[in-house]
Amino acid sequence: MSATTTAARPGTAGAGAFTSIGRLDALDWALPLVPRDRRGAARAVLAFRAEVQAVADGAAPRPEKRGRLAAWRLELDALEAGLPATPVTIALQQPLHRHRLPRTELENLVLAADMDAGGVMVAPPQCDLRLYTRRSGGALIILLAAVLGDTSHAAGCFGLALGEAMRLTTLLRDLGPAARAGRLCLPRESLAEAGIVAASTAEVLDHPALDAACAPVAATASERFADARLMLPEVALPARPFLRAVLEAHEDLLETLHARGRGAAVQPPPSPGRVALAARVLRHRFRGAA
């Protein structure tokens, strides 16, 4: 089977599989804040992220998942050469050149999915968690900032801060369903400090010290949100409304998770309130880039 054929069938999350990005989230709701002539490019980036993550989240055997993700990396080579073979990469062809999307960040999205597919994200060391959030969250925000016209060093630093904070927050949000599917984003250092020793990822959810293990992750997310807020004025004006809305929506989510405490891991993950998100989009649309 050729690489492009494999990439054309990346696989989706099968029945009962954990899907980490399947539902509508703040990124989707904030899309109206992206200028109309750039919105298609933003959707193409989000679609690529969804395609590769669907491979990791699917029910296929681990070697098959990793093979498909390797094929996606070859497909990025084809995209760069002007020969994309999948609907997603065809949609990325014009944005790649028009908005100078960094190929390395597209590849980082694939590498993050490979960490999921390869079983790395089960009580990973702190260094691996940091690498994962950089590849999955940082890469995504850097790509979206590029779509919005800012490929500067300042935008890159902002993207790393917001991407890490955003991804840590969504990992905490999805802690329950992920653990029941055999994943656990909490770093092993935090689990050890909290005194959690469990035979399975699902058992961690019932441990009375779960809040203590989550606290350092939440604290890091909060610190990185603060970093992103300080850096936002350095980002190009046209990019700010969308990025500010995404930042604030995920900050609100982190506060919701903190209020729910240990219950956040055993209850259905909270989704952003549609009315609140719509109001935020309208507020930022009228507020503009100020």
Model-found features: residue ranges?
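Catalytic cores of Mg2+-dependent Asp-rich isoprenoid enzymes
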Residues: 1-166, 172, 176-290
